[in-house]
Amino acid sequence: DKDYLSTRIAYKLNLTGPALTIQTACSSSLVAVHMACESLRSGECSMAIAGGIGITFPQTGGYLYQKGMIFSPDGICRPFDAEANGTFAGNGFGIVVLRRLEDALVDGNTIIAVLR
């Protein structure tokens, strides 16, 4: 069940603290990162894992274009392209591990990016 995915992952990885499943349609991943950053800023936690996942299971349906909807007429997604004409749903995930910069520097963690 999608509502328990974050809790099951936290349990399997022996993580402590809140495990939240956030559902805000297209903004879920960004809201998860925002909430993780707020928890870090407030001192509620010293590390957070945030991200998003989109999986359609089982794959039983095909692609159906309907004029006036958000899906691309040719089934191709062209983000940031002048020829962009809609989106296409697919499976994927993205996860980030977040820490306060000063803590990551002290511990010698590899830093890929800094959120401000």
Question: Where do the model's predicted regions map?
Answer:
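Condensing-enzyme catalytic core of the thiolase-fold
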Residues: D1-R116
